[in-house]
Regions:
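FKBP-type peptidyl-prolyl cis-trans isomerases
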Residues: 1-225
Length: 225
């Protein structure tokens, strides 16, 4: 059956720009491209088609395909990271930066967010807040590994997608119970995306009416004097 908006699929992909890989679900490909992150969780991801869990051009490409489809798709800037916007290149006083600014360095600048230092001219620092991939045409090689229909697997996939972690989940009588790993509330990624996970669990996964997050604390063992 052809994939449609709202379907969950397990997806593998590798994205490249000008022949250089910038993103992939394949750990070996990441190592080969020198973009490997040891702490990252590699392997196929679960996405809900139409929800922009991947860039627009790849998301739209999945509609009408079948499980097992493997293909390449060319994605133009308007359906990838957009065109470059000159207004997103800003100048700041060097004194605004706590450390010596260096060309190519990624920095966070207040409400503007994260950008790249593109030049340092005297006492001024030029920061580009465009995505490094803005204005570029991308190529994705992808494979639809399978269509997911089990609500439990759909919800577990959302958690993995946003939190970057596998978590123990049980689903019964409309209640999803998530056992949180120790120390999760110190994880910035979890704190950032927890609300989104809950929202999409209710909105996108059929049959979930209640979500319970279980966090267990243990009394520290006393050391012998």
């Amino acid at each position: 059956m052809a994939i449609k908006d709202g379907d969950f699929v397990k997806l593998s992909y590798t994205g490249s720009a000008n022949g250089m890989v910038f993103d992939t679900t394949d750990e070996d490909a990441a190592k080969k491209a020198n973009i490997h992150t040891p702490s990252a969780l590699y392997g196929p991801i679960v996405v809900c088609v139409g929800q922009k869990h991947v860039i627009t051009g790849l998301d739209e490409e999945l509609v009408g395909k079948d499980a097992g489809t493997e293909a390449d798709v060319t994605v133009l800037p308007e359906k990838a990271f957009g065109e470059r916007d000159p207004k997103k290149v800003q100048s700041y006083a060097k004194s605004k930066f706590p450390e010596k600014p260096v060309r190519g360095q990624r920095v966070n600048v207040g409400e503007e967010g994260e950008g790249t230092i593109v030049d340092v001219i005297g006492a001024r620092v030029i920061v580009d807040f465009n995505s490094p991939l803005a204005g570029q045409t991308l190529v994705y090689h992808y494979k639809v590994e399978e269509v997911i229909t089990d609500p439990l697997d759909e919800f577990k996939g959302l958690i993995r997608l946003y939190a970057g972690k596998e978590m123990e989940v049980a689903l019964a009588d409309g209640k999803a119970t998530v056992t949180l790993p120790p120390g999760i509330n110190y994880d910035r990624r979890w704190l950032l995306w927890r609300g989104r996970i809950l929202h999409e669990g209710f909105e996108l996964v059929n049959g979930i009416n209640e979500i319970v997050l279980v966090e267990t604390f243990k009394k520290p063992e006393k050391k012998d004097a």
